[in-house]
Swiss-Prot record:
<comment type="similarity">
    <text>Belongs to the ycf54 family.</text>
</comment>
<dbReference type="Pfam" id="PF10674">
    <property type="entry name" value="Ycf54"/>
</dbReference>
<dbReference type="InterPro" id="IPR038409">
    <property type="entry name" value="Ycf54-like_sf"/>
</dbReference>
<protein>
    <recommendedName>
        <fullName>Ycf54-like protein</fullName>
    </recommendedName>
</protein>
<dbReference type="InterPro" id="IPR019616">
    <property type="entry name" value="Ycf54"/>
</dbReference>
């Protein structure tokens, strides 16, 4: 006799699906960001390792991923973020999160980052994680 077992999809797939659904249903949320030069964040400060460790930790705790790395974030083109764009390095990368505490931690750990927040999706920022790259 065959046995049927229900399998649970990996947490990363579930998180991606949930985030996709939120984005497609115009779920308005506040996004916080830490912005730095690509050279600093991707080369001088190996921050990708920190993000990998954080993703692993979230997976073990079955927590929904609430942070993303966005190279050349499109949200900086929104009129309300003109001041941040003027201060941003030409080649930049953002750590974006719906968790303000995480961005505060990033700021404390890295120091040389610009932080801020925005609401999305909106007319000016239809996709909070869109990249110009």
């Amino acid at each position: 006799m065959e046995s049927w077992a229900l399998t649970t999809p990996p947490i990363d797939i579930v998180n991606q699906y949930l985030f996709f659904i939120k984005r497609k249903t115009n779920y308005m949320a506040t996004y916080y960001y830490a912005l730095a030069s690509q050279k600093f964040l991707l080369e001088e400060e190996p921050f990708e390792e920190v993000l990998k460790e954080r993703r692993r930790d979230y997976g073990e705790k079955n927590k929904e991923i609430d942070f993303w790395q966005v190279i050349q974030p499109a949200f900086l083109n929104a009129p309300e973020l003109a001041e941040a764009k003027a201060k941003a390095p030409e080649k930049n990368v953002a750590i974006v999160s719906t968790n303000k505490s995480f961005i505060v931690w990033v700021k404390l750990r890295l120091e040389y980052v610009l932080t801020g927040e925005f609401e999305a999706p909106s007319d000016a920022i239809p996709d909070p994680l869109a990249s110009l790259d």
